[in-house]
């Protein structure tokens, strides 16, 4: 893994890297633990939450978070996420307004963020790649035990939760996969299960009556 450049506009140290394995090559985003800025409400180790988000997306059969793993790099342990070749002028709001055929993908992202307790779903954290696939990125501040949801995705508020989403959320009420739970504290795992139960019992996407749950 070789660092190419530092990514601009990131609050933590974030690097574009080239990854080589035999004849295979790709680019990734490397976020080392040493480059994290201290936060009052999250312990150090945001890189592990990036990996947990990917593992949760896989466990829920959503496939909306790019492949993300723990790796040792030039600046020590960090997360490495597959680099998405995104259409740069697309974001959540443009996709919602102009691509109704992708609304189900956005609904899945909305449900994922509730279960993961995402505190930072900005419009630019929703990508559209050159193959017209929707991706969710930047999950370092997810999975807090206290409910901290902050997101721009409120357009589906009040809609009935689709059965296909209920089917992938309900199993989390009983058990959180080890690939996720081993990256979180026991309190965070229990809170994840409570959020899964809450959205399933409610049967609908929540409405933000306060107008304050935005990143």
Regions from the PLM with identified roles:
Residues 6, 43, 129-215:
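C-terminal catalytic region of ATP-dependent kinase domains
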Residues 1-97, 101-119, 123-124, 130-137, ...:
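Conserved ATP-binding subdomain of kinase catalytic cores across diverse folds
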């Amino acid at each position: 893994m070789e660092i190419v450049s530092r990514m601009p506009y990131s609050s933590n140290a974030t690097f574009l890297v080239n990854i080589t394995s035999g004849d295979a090559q790709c680019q990734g985003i490397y976020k080392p633990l040493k480059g994290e800025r201290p936060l009052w409400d999250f312990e150090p180790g945001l890189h592990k939450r990036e990996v947990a988000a990917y593992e949760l997306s896989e466990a829920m059969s959503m496939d909306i978070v790019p492949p993300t793993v723990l790796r040792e790099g030039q600046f020590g342990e960090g997360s490495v996420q597959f680099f998405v070749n995104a259409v740069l002028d697309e974001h959540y709001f443009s996709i919602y307004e102009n691509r109704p055929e992708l609304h189900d993908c956005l609904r899945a992202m909305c449900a994922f963020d509730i279960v993961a307790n995402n505190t930072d779903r900005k419009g630019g954290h929703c990508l559209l790649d050159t193959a017209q696939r929707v991706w969710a990125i930047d999950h370092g501040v997810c999975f807090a035990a206290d409910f901290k949801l902050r997101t721009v995705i409120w357009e589906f508020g009040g809609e009935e939760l689709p059965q296909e989403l209920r089917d992938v959320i309900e199993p989390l009420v009983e058990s959180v996969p080890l690939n996720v739970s081993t990256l979180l504290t026991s309190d965070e795992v229990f809170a994840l299960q409570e959020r899964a139960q809450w959205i399933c019992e409610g049967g609908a996407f929540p409405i933000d009556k306060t107008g304050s749950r935005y990143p």
